[in-house]
Regions:
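A short acidic (Asp/Glu
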Residues: 16-20, 45-46, 68-71, 102-106
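Short hydrophobic/Thr-rich beta-strand motif most characteristic of the beta2 strand and flanking loop
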Residues: 29-41
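Output/docking surface of receiver
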Residues: 10-12, 35-36, 70, 92-168, ...
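His-Asp phosphorelay/catalytic-motif detector in bacterial-type signaling
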Residues: 81-91
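C-terminal output/effector regions of signal-responsive regulators
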Residues: 136-217
């Protein structure tokens, strides 16, 4: 049963087919729906296309312009653009042994050597398992954030820390799921309004205490 939809990006058709064969061969439980695309020349155009397709993970070759000089970005730049739109999104960059992606990349944990996929016999953690685990970890973080957000929404009263956390969770969910409005605008307004009423009540109580002291005199 399909559980994960993933994308592989490479400018070379034979490499795209190679990756598709790798997933097909190693997907023992048939959980992966795998697509492979040639990158567009312009990053923004390609980014819009792939982010609208709701992939669970994106894997890309590093040197995307090696066989097609019209492509204006490499795999690391593609991943960087993806992560700006979807924080913590599962991304992987595949490189050759003589590649400089590890040196150039900010996060070495997303960079893997292509050769690992052809020599995995006896390995405890195949690359396909790394993809699966990253997706599961990402989904778990989002679900945990949603549960915490729902618990905050159900509270009758939110203090300043609760409100700050609520907005933090809302922003996180928006940037990981591409849901632009996680909390209805009116609920956010009510939350702010409750803080305003709290300030008014505190001010009124302070004024009442001052009046009482004056009356005693």
């Amino acid at each position: 049963m399909i559980q994960y939809k993933i994308l592989y990006v490479d400018e070379v058709e034979s490499e795209r087919n190679r990756f598709l064969r790798y997933i097909h061969k190693n997907d023992d439980e048939k959980e992966f729906l795998t697509e492979a695309l040639e990158p567009d020349a312009e990053l923004e155009k390609f980014l819009e296309k792939i982010l609208n397709d709701n992939y669970d993970a994106i894997i890309t070759d590093h040197k995307l312009s090696e066989a097609n000089p019209l492509i204006q970005y490499d795999g690391l730049e593609l991943v960087e653009a993806i992560l700006k739109s979807r924080i913590d999104f599962p991304c992987f960059v595949l490189t050759s042994f003589d590649d400089d992606a590890v040196r150039d990349g900010d996060d070495v944990n997303i960079v893997y050597i292509k050769g690992l996929m052809t020599n995995e016999e006896g390995h405890l953690a195949k690359f396909i398992y790394k993809i699966k685990n990253q997706i599961k970890h990402h989904r778990k973080k989002i679900e945990k954030a949603k549960i915490e957000l729902e618990e905050l929404i159900k509270k009758e009263y939110l203090d300043a820390l609760d409100e700050a956390r609520l907005l933090e969770l809302d922003t996180y969910i928006e940037k990981t799921t591409n849901v632009k409005i996680s909390i209805p605008p009116q609920l956010k307004s009510l939350s702010n309004l409750s803080e305003l009423h709290k300030m008014i009540d505190n001010t009124e109580q302070l004024l009442a205490n001052i009046r009482e002291k004056k009356d005693v005199k």
